[in-house]
A protein has these predicted regions:
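Active-site-proximal segments of catalytic enzyme domains
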Residues: 3
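C-terminal functional extensions of proteins
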Residues: 6-9, 15-25, 34-122
Length: 122
């Protein structure tokens, strides 16, 4: 049923756009999508900005085992031209993604320490 598929696609795009409107100061990961998600993400970001949301200072990450043109341009480069940073990480998802998650969790745990605890541990 084409109408139902179209409605589902519109619903998904609205949901993605609502998340992108809150991306300021956050991180967007593109994991393994070489064509569709980079295009849809860039359109959702453009819509959010055109609606007046401030979405400039954030980080984007393209994680894939091969570099592709669209993610490099539509995830790493163009979205962060007004601020923020973009990264491309090349490697196998099953290795890189768990390592990246562990690094983020470790960094978050370090920032949760109070200044007193940090001095005592130094």
């Amino acid at each position: 049923d084409g109408a139902a598929m179209g409605q589902g696609s519109l619903s998904d795009f609205r949901l993605l756009t609502s998340v992108v409107t809150q991306l300021e100061g956050g991180v967007f990961f593109n994991v393994g999508s070489a064509v569709i998600l980079p295009e849809v993400f860039l359109k959702a970001l453009s819509l959010a900005r055109n609606l007046g949301y401030v979405v400039n200072a954030f980080t984007t990450v393209d994680l894939d085992f091969v570099r592709h043109y669209r993610p490099q341009v539509n995830v790493v480069s163009r979205p962060t031209q007004q601020g923020g940073r973009g990264f491309h990480i090349t490697g196998h998802h099953e290795i890189i993604f768990p390592l990246l998650c562990a690094a983020v969790l470790e960094a978050l745990a370090e920032t949760e320490d109070t200044p007193t605890e940090r001095r005592q541990n130094a």
